[in-house]
Amino acid sequence: KRQRFSMITDKDTTMIAARNLGKRVPTAAGTLEILSAIDLEIGARESVAVVGVSGSGKSTLLGLLAGLDLPSEGEVWLSGQRLNDMDEDGRARVRGASVGFVFQSFQLLAGLTALENVMLPLELAGEQDARAHATDLLERVGQAERLQHYPKQLSGGEQQRVAIARAFATEPAVLFADEPTGNLDRHTGERIIDLLFDLNRDKGTTLVLVTHDEQLAGRCERLVRLESGRVVADSRTAEPA
Protein backbone atom coordinates (compact mmCIF):
# COMPACT_ATOMS: atom_id res chain seq x y z
CA LYS A 1 0.00 0.00 0.00
CA ARG A 2 1.35 3.39 -1.01
CA GLN A 3 2.14 5.69 1.90
CA ARG A 4 0.96 9.28 1.77
CA PHE A 5 3.11 12.06 3.18
CA SER A 6 1.13 15.07 1.92
CA MET A 7 1.08 17.83 4.54
CA ILE A 8 -2.03 19.81 5.43
CA THR A 9 -0.78 23.37 5.31
CA ASP A 10 -1.91 26.20 7.54
CA LYS A 11 -1.88 28.65 4.64
CA ASP A 12 -5.01 30.04 3.03
CA THR A 13 -4.44 28.71 -0.47
CA THR A 14 -2.77 25.66 -1.96
CA MET A 15 -0.34 27.02 -4.56
CA ILE A 16 1.18 23.73 -5.69
CA ALA A 17 -0.24 20.21 -5.60
CA ALA A 18 1.11 16.90 -6.86
CA ARG A 19 -1.03 13.78 -6.98
CA ASN A 20 0.53 10.31 -7.38
CA LEU A 21 3.34 11.91 -9.37
CA GLY A 22 5.78 9.68 -11.22
CA LYS A 23 8.55 10.18 -13.75
CA ARG A 24 10.24 7.49 -15.84
CA VAL A 25 12.75 7.80 -18.68
CA PRO A 26 13.96 5.19 -21.18
CA THR A 27 17.62 4.17 -21.08
CA ALA A 28 19.74 1.65 -22.96
CA ALA A 29 19.40 -0.68 -19.96
CA GLY A 30 15.63 -0.27 -19.74
CA THR A 31 13.21 2.11 -18.05
CA LEU A 32 14.63 4.23 -15.23
CA GLU A 33 12.20 5.31 -12.53
CA ILE A 34 13.21 8.74 -11.21
CA LEU A 35 10.13 9.63 -9.14
CA SER A 36 7.28 7.49 -7.87
CA ALA A 37 4.01 8.04 -5.95
CA ILE A 38 4.67 11.66 -4.96
CA ASP A 39 1.79 13.33 -3.10
CA LEU A 40 2.48 16.90 -2.05
CA GLU A 41 0.69 20.15 -1.26
CA ILE A 42 2.41 23.50 -0.78
CA GLY A 43 0.53 26.48 0.56
CA ALA A 44 0.67 30.14 -0.36
CA ARG A 45 3.59 32.01 1.26
CA GLU A 46 5.10 28.75 2.51
CA SER A 47 8.85 28.10 2.33
CA VAL A 48 9.68 24.47 1.58
CA ALA A 49 13.06 22.79 1.24
CA VAL A 50 13.37 19.63 -0.86
CA VAL A 51 16.40 17.64 0.28
CA GLY A 52 18.05 14.33 -0.51
CA VAL A 53 21.28 12.85 -1.78
CA SER A 54 22.42 13.33 -5.35
CA GLY A 55 20.22 11.30 -7.67
CA SER A 56 17.23 11.20 -5.31
CA GLY A 57 15.07 13.14 -7.78
CA LYS A 58 15.09 16.63 -6.26
CA SER A 59 15.68 18.65 -9.43
CA THR A 60 13.34 16.42 -11.43
CA LEU A 61 10.58 17.06 -8.89
CA LEU A 62 11.18 20.80 -9.04
CA GLY A 63 10.98 20.71 -12.83
CA LEU A 64 7.64 18.89 -12.72
CA LEU A 65 6.16 21.19 -10.07
CA ALA A 66 7.24 24.23 -12.10
CA GLY A 67 5.84 22.89 -15.36
CA LEU A 68 9.23 22.63 -17.04
CA ASP A 69 8.50 18.98 -17.78
CA LEU A 70 5.48 16.66 -17.70
CA PRO A 71 5.14 13.60 -15.45
CA SER A 72 4.87 10.04 -16.71
CA GLU A 73 1.90 9.61 -14.40
CA GLY A 74 -0.08 11.61 -11.88
CA GLU A 75 -0.99 15.27 -12.04
CA VAL A 76 0.42 18.67 -11.09
CA TRP A 77 -1.52 21.79 -10.17
CA LEU A 78 0.19 25.20 -10.11
CA SER A 79 -1.60 28.41 -9.11
CA GLY A 80 -4.94 26.65 -9.47
CA GLN A 81 -4.26 25.29 -12.96
CA ARG A 82 -3.77 21.66 -13.97
CA LEU A 83 -0.52 21.55 -15.94
CA ASN A 84 -1.22 18.12 -17.44
CA ASP A 85 -3.93 19.65 -19.62
CA MET A 86 -1.53 22.13 -21.24
CA ASP A 87 0.99 22.05 -24.05
CA GLU A 88 4.38 23.74 -23.61
CA ASP A 89 3.02 27.13 -24.71
CA GLY A 90 0.27 26.91 -22.12
CA ARG A 91 2.68 25.93 -19.36
CA ALA A 92 5.00 28.74 -20.42
CA ARG A 93 2.15 31.22 -20.00
CA VAL A 94 1.50 29.94 -16.47
CA ARG A 95 5.21 30.19 -15.65
CA GLY A 96 5.38 33.69 -17.06
CA ALA A 97 2.42 34.82 -14.99
CA SER A 98 3.12 33.04 -11.72
CA VAL A 99 6.66 31.66 -11.44
CA GLY A 100 10.19 32.89 -10.84
CA PHE A 101 13.38 30.80 -11.02
CA VAL A 102 16.82 30.99 -9.42
CA PHE A 103 19.32 28.40 -10.62
CA GLN A 104 22.82 27.39 -9.55
CA SER A 105 24.19 28.51 -12.93
CA PHE A 106 22.63 32.03 -12.76
CA GLN A 107 21.49 31.88 -16.43
CA LEU A 108 21.90 35.58 -17.11
CA LEU A 109 21.93 36.68 -20.75
CA ALA A 110 25.56 37.45 -21.57
CA GLY A 111 24.75 40.18 -24.12
CA LEU A 112 22.63 42.22 -21.70
CA THR A 113 23.73 44.39 -18.80
CA ALA A 114 22.58 43.64 -15.25
CA LEU A 115 19.89 46.28 -15.64
CA GLU A 116 18.74 44.92 -18.99
CA ASN A 117 18.60 41.36 -17.62
CA VAL A 118 16.19 42.48 -14.90
CA MET A 119 14.22 44.73 -17.25
CA LEU A 120 13.58 41.93 -19.74
CA PRO A 121 10.79 40.05 -17.89
CA LEU A 122 9.19 43.37 -16.97
CA GLU A 123 9.16 44.51 -20.60
CA LEU A 124 7.76 41.15 -21.70
CA ALA A 125 4.99 41.64 -19.14
CA GLY A 126 4.25 45.06 -20.64
CA GLU A 127 5.35 47.15 -17.67
CA GLN A 128 5.73 50.82 -18.60
CA ASP A 129 8.24 51.66 -15.85
CA ALA A 130 10.49 48.64 -16.42
CA ARG A 131 13.74 50.61 -16.11
CA ALA A 132 12.78 52.30 -12.84
CA HIS A 133 11.43 49.06 -11.37
CA ALA A 134 14.53 47.08 -12.39
CA THR A 135 16.82 49.78 -11.00
CA ASP A 136 14.97 49.68 -7.68
CA LEU A 137 15.27 45.89 -7.49
CA LEU A 138 19.00 45.96 -8.23
CA GLU A 139 19.49 48.59 -5.56
CA ARG A 140 17.57 46.35 -3.18
CA VAL A 141 19.98 43.47 -3.78
CA GLY A 142 23.04 45.69 -3.42
CA GLN A 143 23.90 46.09 -7.10
CA ALA A 144 23.26 49.81 -7.57
CA GLU A 145 26.84 50.29 -8.79
CA ARG A 146 26.62 47.40 -11.26
CA LEU A 147 23.65 48.41 -13.41
CA GLN A 148 25.65 48.75 -16.63
CA HIS A 149 27.96 45.79 -16.04
CA TYR A 150 27.69 42.67 -18.16
CA PRO A 151 27.58 39.23 -16.50
CA LYS A 152 31.22 38.48 -17.34
CA GLN A 153 32.19 41.62 -15.39
CA LEU A 154 30.41 40.41 -12.24
CA SER A 155 31.52 37.97 -9.56
CA GLY A 156 29.51 34.81 -8.92
CA GLY A 157 27.78 36.37 -5.94
CA GLU A 158 26.95 39.50 -7.92
CA GLN A 159 25.53 37.44 -10.78
CA GLN A 160 23.31 35.52 -8.37
CA ARG A 161 22.06 38.78 -6.85
CA VAL A 162 21.09 39.97 -10.32
CA ALA A 163 19.40 36.62 -10.96
CA ILE A 164 17.40 36.99 -7.74
CA ALA A 165 16.35 40.52 -8.68
CA ARG A 166 15.22 39.20 -12.06
CA ALA A 167 13.33 36.32 -10.43
CA PHE A 168 11.38 38.70 -8.19
CA ALA A 169 10.85 41.34 -10.90
CA THR A 170 7.34 40.27 -11.85
CA GLU A 171 6.44 39.49 -8.22
CA PRO A 172 5.76 35.80 -8.89
CA ALA A 173 3.37 33.84 -6.73
CA VAL A 174 5.92 31.00 -6.57
CA LEU A 175 9.72 31.04 -6.64
CA PHE A 176 11.64 27.85 -7.44
CA ALA A 177 15.31 27.82 -6.44
CA ASP A 178 17.55 24.90 -7.49
CA GLU A 179 20.81 24.80 -5.49
CA PRO A 180 21.05 28.63 -5.63
CA THR A 181 24.32 28.71 -3.66
CA GLY A 182 25.97 25.69 -5.29
CA ASN A 183 28.58 27.71 -7.20
CA LEU A 184 29.30 30.18 -4.39
CA ASP A 185 31.63 30.16 -1.40
CA ARG A 186 30.04 29.74 2.04
CA HIS A 187 30.12 33.42 3.03
CA THR A 188 28.68 34.65 -0.27
CA GLY A 189 26.13 31.84 -0.25
CA GLU A 190 24.87 32.81 3.20
CA ARG A 191 24.39 36.42 2.10
CA ILE A 192 22.50 35.28 -0.99
CA ILE A 193 20.21 33.08 1.10
CA ASP A 194 19.58 35.94 3.56
CA LEU A 195 18.52 38.05 0.59
CA LEU A 196 16.33 35.29 -0.82
CA PHE A 197 14.43 34.84 2.45
CA ASP A 198 14.13 38.60 3.03
CA LEU A 199 12.50 39.07 -0.36
CA ASN A 200 10.39 35.96 0.14
CA ARG A 201 8.94 37.37 3.36
CA ASP A 202 8.48 40.88 2.00
CA LYS A 203 6.71 39.74 -1.17
CA GLY A 204 4.74 36.87 0.38
CA THR A 205 6.03 34.51 -2.28
CA THR A 206 5.78 30.73 -2.01
CA LEU A 207 9.37 29.42 -1.98
CA VAL A 208 10.39 25.92 -3.08
CA LEU A 209 14.11 25.39 -2.52
CA VAL A 210 16.08 22.35 -3.71
CA THR A 211 19.29 21.90 -1.74
CA HIS A 212 21.70 19.31 -0.37
CA ASP A 213 22.60 21.74 2.45
CA GLU A 214 20.77 20.63 5.62
CA GLN A 215 21.58 23.89 7.42
CA LEU A 216 20.04 25.90 4.61
CA ALA A 217 17.03 23.57 4.50
CA GLY A 218 16.46 24.21 8.20
CA ARG A 219 15.75 27.86 7.47
CA CYS A 220 12.60 26.90 5.57
CA GLU A 221 9.31 26.34 7.35
CA ARG A 222 9.05 22.82 6.04
CA LEU A 223 11.34 20.04 4.88
CA VAL A 224 10.48 17.38 2.29
CA ARG A 225 13.01 14.56 2.06
CA LEU A 226 13.41 12.35 -1.00
CA GLU A 227 15.05 8.94 -1.15
CA SER A 228 15.22 6.96 -4.39
CA GLY A 229 12.52 9.11 -5.95
CA ARG A 230 10.00 8.85 -3.10
CA VAL A 231 8.97 11.20 -0.31
CA VAL A 232 10.11 9.58 2.95
CA ALA A 233 9.55 12.55 5.27
CA ASP A 234 7.53 15.77 5.25
CA SER A 235 7.78 17.83 8.41
CA ARG A 236 7.89 21.28 9.91
CA THR A 237 11.32 22.62 10.81
CA ALA A 238 12.10 23.76 14.33
CA GLU A 239 13.47 27.21 13.58
CA PRO A 240 12.46 28.63 10.19
CA ALA A 241 14.26 31.77 9.02
Tell me the role of every PLM-derived stretch.
Residues 1-24, 233-241:
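ABC-family P-loop ATPase nucleotide-binding domain
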Residues 16-228:
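ABC family nucleotide-binding domain
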